[in-house]
Amino acid sequence: MYKRQLLACALIPIWYKSLAVGDGAGQISSDRATAYYAVAIAVMTVVSALIGPVCGAIADHMRIKKAIFSTTVVVGVSACILNGFTLTWVLFLVIYVLTKIFYNASLVFYDSMLVDVTTKDRMDEVSSYGYAWGYLGSCVPFLVSLAAYICGPDMLGYISNRLSMIIGFAVTGIWWFVVTIPLFKSYKQVNYVSDAADKDIHKNFENDAFIRDNIKEKNKTNKNPGVLRLIADAFAQIFGTIKKIATKDKKVGLFLVAFFLYIDGVGTIIDNCINIGTDLKLDSVGQVVFLLFTQIVACIGSLIFGRLSQTYKTTTLLYVCIAGYFAVCLYALTLHDLIGFGIMAFGVGCFQGSLQALSRSYFSKII
């Protein structure tokens, strides 16, 4: 699934600052704009964290996952396109937060598909390849958006900054939808909860064709629960899972706590890097170029760590990625020029996709 983060990192903060900062009616200072942006990201994170478990529980029901995944993608794409038409920074933040919430919700369903498309021994590799090609694919709409933003006013005259942002958001949303079409068409849910009362999760299919056939047969005979029953079952499953983690699967609980903490750090760096660079008065075009470079490095890094996962334990590689990210954070404290920003971008790229991919595959294996 296509990663939208490059546009979010680069052009969105720049456009947001142009709407928010100034002496006009309703406009504010640069520092306050950065603070409000960070608050909006925090709200998005909290809401996503609250609805994530519900989405995950619902995703376990048979024949439900693809339909709800498709809904979150369509709503997210629509909100993404609407971002370009906002006239005030407040409205922009509201729609942007909604876009991110539905994007994150779609990722819950997307990530849960990993156990349906591969076997346990290949999860690290498949997950890493998914992130690698996602980061590389994100360069396509970003380059189109960047060309419209930088070159449009000079080369074509009639393309204003506002129109270039409309083009950028539209291209991003359309690209997000188009590259998800193969998943809409080809994905088939194999693992599911057929009855939330007994929590019978059919997931240990590996290469057993007999189990696969039995699951497909059950899919033909069982009916989907109603909406209210589905939500009630989701909460029942969440509470049951929490109880199980607290009493039996403490390894899963420990990982979830750790993941929540370190992945929030990853998200903070991704979402605020351009804001920080702008506040330091760094050249905006240079920052964008380095972020494009980050995507390419992230693609290569994900592929390398995917290969390394065949030799080393996933936990060992996770420790390496977390330590690397921590070192990047320490280095960022000394940031004062564009070259330093480029070095930081390279460091982020080395570990960003790898940490996300390995976290996804590791969690899929331990559950």
Positions of the model-derived regions?
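Glycine-rich segments within core transmembrane alpha-helices of 12-TM secondary carriers
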Residues: S127-Y149
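Helix-loop boundary and gating motifs at the non-cytosolic
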Residues: K3-T45, K251-A258, Y262-D283, Q287-F290
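C-terminal membrane-cytosol helix-exit motif in multi-pass small-molecule transporters
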Residues: S145-P153, G173-S194
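Juxtamembrane intracellular "pre-TM" segments in multi-pass secondary transporters
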Residues: Q189-L256
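Helix-loop junctions at membrane interfaces in 12-TM secondary transporters
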Residues: G84-Y96, L333-M344
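Structural signature of the two symmetry-related core transmembrane helices
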Residues: A67-L82, T316-Y331
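Helix-to-loop junctions at the C-terminal end of transmembrane segments
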Residues: L50-R63, I300-K313
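Intracellular juxtamembrane helix-capping segments at the cytosolic ends
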Residues: A105-T119, S354-I367
